[in-house]
């Protein structure tokens, strides 16, 4: 019997892609394939690609070309495969298979077919699959953190975004399925679950006829996981019911990732997000009133077609006014297949880059000021790494999401994968510094009156 080939994975892109990669690893391992972290030693490399913006495509193509030039057999999975299947098959003879964004559960069958000499194109025209708790999964995050996908796909048609074309219509998992997987992850020692989808506040709309995020959060409150974090919360979906569920569910962090994209009503209308322009300020103010300790992250696009200096200043003032904890800014990238690619009055590349840099410069003193407000506080920190040269522990407090926000550098003994209480001693623009709290610190904290 011929031995099965050894497989390595090259993961690119977002956390949704990461979950797809984790399921493919789990399925192949269950089927008896060897998984090697070293691409040089593997017989086949599965590259799970990203195609969200031009820079992501370029990174994906560079990775594919480097592997092809080294003589590797390649399976191209993910968004680039979904987007450019014909070109990839024509231009990369080393590609033995393509796997679409809704087809990763077929990876074992795909590999088996390639072993018999077939060149496989496993891409569904309309992605419709979503994994549940029964599909094997091998996590690639640190042991204490897991992403938990609640839905896949998107029914919105923002002018700049290719995601609905690449990932299909929204399809939500059942509450029972999500809670079951959360319990599995808790049993593995996970301390933090990060809820993800394209629009998490729309969770359940397709399945139940109405958004059900509030009910899902309350159900997850019964799972033995200390931290539950919400990503991709659209502002108009933050209803009083959702805000109440965040406030009243003990393990749901008051951390919200709000993909606002812009502030000016004219640009939001051009982005096909006209509903947002008149509610941004009001929703953020209501959030801060209802959740005084809320940590707010958002992302913006600089240089969208038609963006004038007036529009740009409006966005800059919006950032200054609301003092977000974390801000990411992308220069607009025109994407084939989106409405924005044909919009008039494109902004020159050098202006887009300059505006992006200016927005980040606007945010930096705000971020540093908000971080420095943590100095002297006792906070829980999830310890994830040990610095190889200094021995400092590296973790995150509740105000930092994995991969996209800052970290906390911690002096003192602390076990990896555990929450420890840390006194914050210093801060900079992106990170905090602290030391493991002493018994005296903890005693003094216990004597303080509750501020709740």
Curated annotation (Swiss-Prot):
First-tier enzyme category under EC: transferase
An annotated GO cellular component: cytosol
Enzyme Commission (EC) number: 2.8.4.4
Example GO BP: tRNA modification
GO molecular-function terms, A-Z: 4 iron, 4 sulfur cluster binding; aspartic acid methylthiotransferase activity; metal ion binding; protein methylthiotransferase activity
Key words of the record: 4Fe-4S, Cytoplasm, Iron, Iron-sulfur, Metal-binding, S-adenosyl-L-methionine, Transferase
SMART domains: Elp3 (SM00729)
Swiss-Prot/TrEMBL cofactor(s): [4Fe-4S] cluster
Primary subcellular site in the record, as a coarse category: cytoplasm
Entry-linked InterPro entries: Elp3/MiaA/NifB-like_rSAM, Methylthiotransferase, Methylthiotransferase_CS, Methylthiotransferase_N, Methylthiotransferase_N_sf, NA-bd_OB-fold, Ribosomal_uS12_MeSTrfase_RimO, rSAM
Residue ranges constituting the TRAM domain according to the UniProt record: 372-438
Keyword Iron set for record: yes
PROSITE patterns recorded: MTTASE_N (PS51449), MTTASE_RADICAL (PS01278), RADICAL_SAM (PS51918), TRAM (PS50926)
Keyword 4Fe-4S: yes
HAMAP family: MTTase_RimO
Protein's name according to its UniProt entry: Ribosomal protein uS12 methylthiotransferase RimO
Organism: Synechococcus elongatus (strain ATCC 33912 / PCC 7942 / FACHB-805)
Species lineage: Bacteria, Bacillati, Cyanobacteriota, Cyanophyceae, Synechococcales
